[in-house]
A protein has these predicted regions:
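PAZ/PAZ-like end-binding module
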Residues: 1-197
Length: 197
């Protein structure tokens, strides 16, 4: 009996969650997410929200927790891309600032370092800065209602990679040895190829 009560309670919770999601999403779709959804997306989502609401008060009044969860997941599949666009719009500037702060920090940190360290770190910083600038320009011409070409998570990954590489360079006092690039033997033979006039 307790197990049956538990199932009924879970189903009730899932139904309430689905119902709340329908109302919340309808509100956000025409307010918060307005500029982040295409007209066809808004139309499709509105239609699905209306169908779900009608189902909840007609056929879906007494279903299992799994049925309500499945309905919720179906709606989220439609809404999640829009929510990602909205959230990433706010997260990108902060992530970009963090990356630019890291670049400035490393540029300042290597000013008195040996030339090989300074040049290697400055090259990594320039590469990260150029990547950010190019991607930001691409993103700036995109409408807000399409999936971003530059995600804040990509900027964070670039900042993490920059931190790892620059720290390795500064610890080893020189450019990191990149195992995939076996050109170290080329550097030793270059001196013999020079000709005098």
């Amino acid at each position: 009996l307790a197990q049956q009560d538990n199932k009924v309670e879970q189903a009730k919770e899932k139904k309430n969650t689905l119902e709340s999601y329908v109302y919340d999403t309808r509100n956000k779709l025409f307010n918060t997410y307005r500029g982040f959804a295409t007209d066809s997306e808004k139309e499709q989502i509105s239609k699905n929200l209306q169908q779900t609401e009608e189902w909840l008060y007609e056929d879906g009044d007494d279903e299992s927790a799994n049925v309500y969860s499945d309905r919720l997941q179906d709606l989220k599949k439609l809404v999640d891309p829009i929510e990602i666009r909205y959230k990433d719009e706010g997260g990108r500037p902060e992530a970009a600032k963090h990356l630019l702060d890291s670049i400035a920090k490393y540029r300042a940190a290597v000013q008195s370092s040996p030339p090989s360290v300074r040049e290697a770190v400055l090259a990594e910083c320039a590469q990260a800065e150029q990547w950010l600038q190019e991607k930001t320009q691409e993103q700036d011409i995109q409408p807000r209602n399409v999936n971003p070409v530059l995600l804040s998570s990509d900027i964070k990954k670039t900042a993490e990679a920059l931190n790892t590489i620059c720290n390795d360079i500064m610890k080893s006092k020189g450019p990191p040895q990149r195992p995939e690039n076996n050109s170290s033997s080329d550097h030793t033979s270059q001196g013999g190829d020079m000709q005098e006039d």
